[in-house]
Design a protein with these regions (language model features):
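Amphipathic alpha-helical segments typified by the pilin-like N-terminal helix
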Residues: 22-46
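Low-complexity, acidic interaction segments enriched in glycine
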Residues: 60-193
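A generic short-segment signal for beta-strand/edge and adjacent turn/coil regions
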Residues: 18-20, 41, 131-132
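N-terminal alpha-helical signal peptides/signal-anchor transmembrane segments
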Residues: 41-62
């Protein structure tokens, strides 16, 4: 082997090592991003489900969905919901009103704080336990200083006007602090319920 071949080999060996590092690092950073992204999306989906739960309860009490978080949080913190305890069974031959009048059944209504009713034991047991429920940060997108967007209105479906709501955020807000450029997510797209 000539002297020139040795010099070229000495230059190419470190160059190959550097290139191998960059290839490994680019693959590894994508894998790490996907792992973190999966957790962040799951966390936001859980918070969106929590907010949906509040909206549904809000509508039960107020007959409409809220289009702002102030009224939703105020409802959750300060309002109460009726819990009806039914005692007895209505016979098939009678309506509830008739059975109630005859004393066959009875109804007892109690009022409980909205947050205790909305986030009852049944709901809490169905939540993803990796992400604890924090009412003080319910409207904030995790890992960012941004809030979710909320909107409510009416939509006509098959000649029937239906009340609807949407709570959303962008993937850009979900991935705050991560290098999400050129990844498999469109940062402007919405994650919503």
């Amino acid at each position: 082997i000539t002297m020139k071949a040795k010099q070229i080999a000495l230059i190419l060996i470190p160059l190959n090592i550097i290139l191998a590092y960059f290839v490994y690092n680019s693959i590894n950073s994508e894998v790490e991003f996907q792992q973190v992204a999966k957790v962040r999306v799951a966390e936001n989906v859980q918070k969106l489900k929590d907010l949906r739960q509040v909206q549904i309860a809000y509508k039960k009490v107020n007959n409409t969905y809220s289009n702002n978080f102030e009224s939703l949080i105020d409802f959750l913190e300060n309002d109460s919901m009726a819990i009806v305890k039914a005692i007895g069974e209505t016979p098939d031959s009678l309506t509830d009103a008739q059975a109630l009048e005859l004393g066959i059944i009875s109804r007892d209504t109690a009022y409980v704080l909205a947050k205790e009713t909305v986030f009852d034991e049944a709901y809490l047991s169905s939540r993803n336990e990796k992400f604890p429920l924090d009412l003080s940060a319910l409207t904030t997108v995790p890992h960012s200083d941004q809030n979710y967007s909320v909107d409510a209105g009416m939509v006509e479906k098959g000649k029937v006007v239906v009340q609807v709501f949407e709570i959303s955020t962008t993937y850009g807000a979900v991935f705050t602090g991560l290098d999400a450029e050129n990844k498999s997510f469109e940062l402007g797209n919405l994650l919503k319920v």
